[in-house]
Amino acid sequence: MFESKINPLWQSFILAVQEEVKPALGCTEPISLALAAAAAAAELDGTVERIDAWVSPNLMKNGMGVTVPGTGMVGLPIAAALGVLGGDAKAGLEVLKDASAKAVADAKAMLAAGHVAVMLQEPCNDILFSRAKVYSGDSWACVTIVGDHTNIVRIETDKGVVFTQADNAQEEEKTSPLGVLSHTSLEEILAFVNAVPFDAIRFILDAARLNGALSQEGLRGSWGLHIGSTLAKQCDRGLLAKDLSTAILIRTSAASDARMGGATLPAMSNSGSGNQGITATVPVMVVAEHVGADDERLARALMLSHLSAIYIHHQLPRLSALCAATTAAMGAAAGMAWLIDGRYDTIAMAISSMIGDVSGMICDGASNSCAMKVSTSASAAWKALLMALDDTAVTGNEGIVAHNVEQSIANLCSLACRSMQQTDKQIIEIMASKAH
């Protein structure tokens, strides 16, 4: 068995990827509220008549403008209503995967009747917080999710507390497979990818299957801003070259178009985000096809991409003012570099150049325009790699880029953790003023 060849560090890497790379149907912030609502509804015997919900400012930001799959509607209220009326509380981030047309119609009717209210949780010290309280006659149930999109910390009904999660976050961090990322390095991740038995990481090929299907759907339909299909038309008109760079741009954009436009296909997410999963997957797939990589080489490249993206994102808040498509694309740069020459120095140079390029991109909420940022990040990854292949990169003498890639990553993440907190507040204020 391959388990005997895997040391504890490598096993932690595999578990970290399995924990952070999961199928998700729909943008994960509204889906988190849908899950809370579905879990609350599951505690009641009668038909839910009314929903009150509270979310953190960051979750509100990422839920205001994004389409909920299968509904043609944007926002948190429809997500909460559909979670109650058609959600499967046991399905995690795929809570809405089996929602029927009748459930969608009933959810829209509940909204039209004014029976769904979504409010800001104030005060709120949690970046990711969603709470749904549902009512049926004199009975009610309330579910709270904190810290992670599926992390239910409390279930309560009118009869009393059903479940509460012990407050042992620090101990869990020590034992979590993600905890090992705080004291590892990109070099150790690369060594793992080069030597781990293929059978131990074969599962990552599911990312190519799911996100590849989303890309194809994005090119077929008119989803979201339809960036991918629009750019494909411009190729046919002779305004854009049909080359590898354009293929990366078009196919990655198309997957995000479908994702944000409400296609009823799951994305393989990364760090709680479908767009991050798409960004870490599709560029690597395109380059793998170009170089004729077999399944094993594709799996190793995808594992490097996804694990590098997780490694960087682990140094960030779960949600922040920094667009994390940029950090996911740093993972993609690593995966593409591995396919082309496999050298650590190439990977490090590509990531450093990306930090010198797209590090200022803000997250102004989940919406169709996320596909623009995904496409920009994917293109930046390819550009940075082309430079690195010629031993050219942004150096430690420039901006926030340091003389080694690990410090460059730390510098970028420190901006998001500290300085960009005020940026985040300003973004939320601007978006809230538009909603009134």
Swiss-Prot record:
Q: What species does this protein belong to?
A: Salmonella choleraesuis (strain SC-B67)
Q: Sorted alphabetically, which Pfam families does this protein's record hold?
A: SDH_alpha
Which terms under GO biological process does the entry name? L-cysteine catabolic process to pyruvate
By sequence similarity, the record places it as follows: Belongs to the UPF0597 family.
Protein name (record)? UPF0597 protein YhaM
Disulfide bonding pattern of the chain: none
Would you say which domain of life the source belongs to? Bacteria
Q: What one GO molecular function would you report for this record?
A: L-cysteine desulfhydrase activity
